[in-house]
Amino acid sequence: MSSLNKSPFLKIFLSYLPVIMLFFSVFNEFDFNYLKLDYFSFNFVHLLIFFWTLRNPDQLGYLAIFFAGIINDVVIGVPIGISSFCYLILCSVTAYIRNITLSPNFMKDWISLLLTILLINSIQVIILDLVFLIKVDYTNYLINTGFTFLFYPIFFLFFNFLNERISYQIND
């Protein structure tokens, strides 16, 4: 088993796993529509980008995030560039938080996630509704923001475990 832990394939796979998860989630439009749950949705991509650009920005590059936004726009059918713009705003906020934070704190990160997602969704709604005149359901955005905020602790634990494994494999 120890030979598997020292495998070069495993090191490479783990180092690219956040990027793989990002592109997998934007290609699939990760949601729960197939469960026929009307008022349940969360934005996995926002959680992924927020965590990795805040805790380990070397694992998820800004160019990959930009292209993931372009792909997301094509998949969901909104004008190209809106998701990329919102994802890069998310990256900017996390870079700012990372630079002003002396010691990482889960609760502060969680609250800043809520404020950041509210900002991003507000910008996206304004662009879609006022600029492109696309009908937007405000309730869905509010529900999505709430569930994304509530699911952050679960995904934080998963991403933190993954981050430790990646750091262990790279430093080994």
Regions picked out by a protein language model, each given a short descriptive name:
Residues M1-D172:
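Terminal, non-globular segments
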